[in-house]
Amino acid sequence: MSTRTLVATLALVAVTLGAAATAFAGDKDLVLRRLADRTESQASPGHFNADPDLPAFRALSKDLGVVMGPKFLAPAETLGQAGFDVGFEFSFTSVNTNADHWRALESQDAGAGFATGQLHVRKGLPFSLELGGSLTHLFESEMFAVGTELKFSLNEGFFYLPDFAVRGTFNTVVGASDLNLATTGFDVSISKSFGVVGVVNITPYAGYNYLVIFSSSRLLDVAPEDPSPPTINEATGDLEFQPEFVFDTQQQQLNRFFGGTRFLFGVLALTLEANISENAQTYSGRVGFDF
């Protein structure tokens, strides 16, 4: 299977699973209309106007961008032209669970944080390049993220110098009926491997990630129980009530720092990692096979 086919397959699986899960909303699914206050219209009693809370939407998007954004879980070295790696990753993201914007969750409670599971595949290419694809699921929800990445190692295996790499990423979320969310960014990382008594290869690594989060909403309604369409006051030309609203596209930047260690036993690779940003901390583990 070619790498292009592999990434396309991950995207197809995510869309299929997201469509199949629409009838099973979980505690971590979104009800974005809660991010607007509804006030009764003075011009049309019994009907409501929407007062959207944009700062809450931006804060929610920023936190979910970290939760569903790219994970690292690999040293700076590439796999080599013939290399192939597949693994399963588990991550837990700790956020400010008392923040007001979590009222937009189905349960209206973020609990202890957010857990995700991820299938991550990487393929080595010529010229110290590496292409990857990922499929991430947010537990207790119907949300998935499809990701792709391209890494270039500027130095690997050269004398005693550490390996150094640059990676670009793009992730998009599917399965959220109210939300459009995507992330893009780049990271730089360094690592150095060493063997221990011929049994295990240990590779500590660290790096920096610049992440850009794009978010917007679809059409929302603070009074879904009221089927009445908005009406126009003939005298003024103004709407008498307007329960529908949209959060326009928002762009936010985030700096993240990460570090971890990979333990390689033959083809079996175990990796532990932590990454930290201003609004969240993510702790991850990975079990993979490096061929």
Residue ranges of model-derived segments:
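Bacterial N-terminal signal peptides that target proteins for export
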Residues: 1-10
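Sec/Tat signal peptide C-region and signal peptidase I cleavage site
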Residues: 17-25
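Transmembrane beta-barrel domains of Gram-negative outer membranes and organellar outer membranes
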Residues: 25-157
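Residues on the lipid-exposed face of transmembrane beta-strands in outer-membrane beta-barrel proteins
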Residues: 74-75, 86-88, 119-125, 148-152, ...
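Residues that define the transmembrane beta-barrel architecture of outer-membrane proteins
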Residues: 80-82, 112-117, 142-146, 180-186, ...
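Transmembrane beta-strands of outer-membrane beta-barrel pores
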Residues: 90-94, 135-141, 152-154, 168-174, ...
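Outer membrane beta-barrel transmembrane domains
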Residues: 97-108, 205-291
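Repeated loop/turn-to-beta-strand initiation elements of outer-membrane beta-barrel proteins
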Residues: 127-131, 157-162, 198, 202, ...
